[in-house]
């Protein structure tokens, strides 16, 4: 049975698992020359990864991860460290020079692109050894049951990855039927997950560096593709051992999941 999600975005129970990889890259929206990465996987990226696990068709699962019928919390488990990796790109413009082989009724005609030129060197900013704890709840019972079965059995229809298909991910420490317990904010509260607030709402701490991002959160299907309908602003701590501290005036609903305090969004 799928969990109910209340008006504050808190589910009655959820699935929890850890996802990690050697590398990760979540391309920032609006960047073209340098391939910069988000430090935290966007909510839409997590949705795509879970859809790959259950084998959902492209553009078919956006309603499952809507703003009101899904809840996701993301907790960094590793320090958010990046490196730049140069890669050589090869253009695919069909107007570029090509070479054709001779063909006849018994043979195929093959077309080869002239690869002696039109190469570009791109620098990819990638996360090194990223690891995240994901808590997820979905009201779509069929999808949720299939996801739970795959996670528990360690199977997937398509291999999960962290951003790029070559950055294959490992999923471990799966827990089911986790019941979040609502936490009261007594002056301040430390949150382990990323928190959907502005930087001005985070309480400063000595020797703790906060980061902020704005990334796609919810998408809808449209003819010929998809469209982002919501972006999330959130705060995270650069070091995995440090929490984000919030005050009692902060408009979020923190919950306890195991030994972690998280905020669903």
Swiss-Prot record:
Regions crossing the membrane: none
Q: Which Gene3D superfamilies match?
A: 3.30.70.2660
Q: Name one process (GO BP) from the record.
A: defense response to virus
The UniProt keywords, alphabetically, are: Antiviral defense, Cytoplasm, Plasmid
Q: Name one GO cellular component term.
A: cytoplasm
Name where it's found: Cytoplasm
Q: What happens when the gene is disrupted?
A: Loss of the 8 Cas genes in this locus (cas1, cas2, cas3, cas4, cas5, cas6, cas7 and cas8b) leads to loss of CRISPR interference against plasmid targeted by this CRISPR locus, i.e. plasmid is not destroyed by CRISPR.
The role this protein plays is: CRISPR (clustered regularly interspaced short palindromic repeat) is an adaptive immune system that provides protection against mobile genetic elements (viruses, transposable elements and conjugative plasmids). CRISPR clusters contain sequences complementary to antecedent mobile elements and target invading nucleic acids. CRISPR clusters are transcribed and processed into CRISPR RNA (crRNA). Plasmid targeted by CRISPR locus P1 transform wild-type cells very poorly.
Assembly, in brief, is: Component of the Cascade-like complex (Cascade I-B), composed of Cas5, Cas6, Cas7 and crRNA.
The further comment given in this record reads:
There are 3 CRISPR RNA loci in this organism and a single cas gene locus. A CRISPR-Cas type I-B system.
Descriptive protein name:
CRISPR-associated protein Cas5
